[in-house]
Regions:
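Conserved small/polar residues in nucleotide/adenosyl-binding loops
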Residues: 245-246
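Alpha-to-beta junction loops
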Residues: 232-237
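N-terminal subdomain of lithium-sensitive/metallo-dependent phosphomonoesterases centered on the IMPase/IPPase/PAP
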Residues: 19-112, 168, 204-207
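Compositionally biased, intrinsically disordered low-complexity segments enriched in Pro/Arg/Gln/His
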Residues: 13-14
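Acidic beta-strand-loop-alpha-helix segment within the catalytic core
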Residues: 130-228
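Residue-level signal for inorganic ion chemistry
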Residues: 43, 69, 80, 115, ...
Length: 246
């Protein structure tokens, strides 16, 4: 398959059949990282613009949908068209189960995770992109555009965190995670929970945890930022029941 970019802002995927699996994986990861960063930039253009129209639509499940959701989706969808895998996106076209049940690999995307946090303007929203192969996540990127922090990882190479320059989108201060105990330091038993979707079941679980961890510190956060806090060692557990929303 010939993979090539139609956007000069996005890296080309290699077409040379002699490239190693490692090189192909690296180019794929770089394309996805760049897509997440460009999507984050599109979101921030709307988030910071003084004349932004904050009109909100409602999807079938009554969750909010904004212009930023759509812009981010468009950026990511264009980038992922270069790859041989189909896209299942929170804001994309509905894919019937009979069609996608036979997909061996696919991209799963939430172009703006934490739309409620975006509307509250508390900076706790993310761009999420994952490649799932045979039911297993093998590559993932989470970008927190308002905080200029990027997380990424692959099944083969592990997970990493970096700071991002919002102007150039260049990465710096790259660290592999999980971090060492020395880097994390001493802290109380920390539980991270949803800021907008904290259910009674989750609250009960947290109180149960408090009996064995009297020093429990509850931290509320939005979107997939909660998972990033656990990955960084800034939280010990993210409890959620089946009815809750990430």
């Amino acid at each position: 398959m010939h993979w090539a970019s139609t956007d000069k802002c996005l890296p080309l995927l290699p077409t040379n059949p002699n490239y190693s699996i490692y090189t192909l994986r690296h180019h794929m990861l770089e394309l996805v990282i760049r897509a997440a960063l460009e999507a984050g930039r599109a979101i921030m253009d709307i988030y910071t613009h003084p004349d932004t129209d904050w009109e909100v639509e409602r999807k079938a499940d009554n969750s909010p949908l904004t212009l930023a959701d759509r812009r981010s989706h468009a950026v990511i969808a264009q980038a992922l068209e270069q790859t041989p895998y189909p896209l299942l996106s929170e804001e994309g076209a509905h894919q019937p189960y009979d069609e996608r049940k036979d997909w061996e690999a696919l991209w799963i995307v939430d172009p703006l995770d934490g739309t409620k946090e975006f509307l509250k303007r508390n900076d706790e929203f993310t761009v999420n992109i994952a490649l799932v192969q045979h039911g297993t996540p093998t590559l993932g990127v989470i970008y927190v555009p308002a905080k200029h922090v990027l997380f990424w990882g692959t099944q083969a190479d592990g997970a990493f965190r970096a700071e991002v320059d919002p102007e150039t989108l260049e990465r710096s201060e790259v660290k592999q995670i999980p971090l060492t105990a020395e880097e994390i330091g001493e802290c109380p038993y920390r539980v991270v929970a949803s800021r907008s979707h904290l259910s009674e079941e989750t609250q009960t679980l947290i109180e149960d945890l408090r009996t064995s961890h009297p020093d429990l510190d509850l931290v509320s956060a939005g979107s997939s930022l909660k998972l990033c806090l656990v990955a960084e060692g800034k939280a010990d557990i993210y409890p959620r029941d089946r009815k809750s929303v990430v």
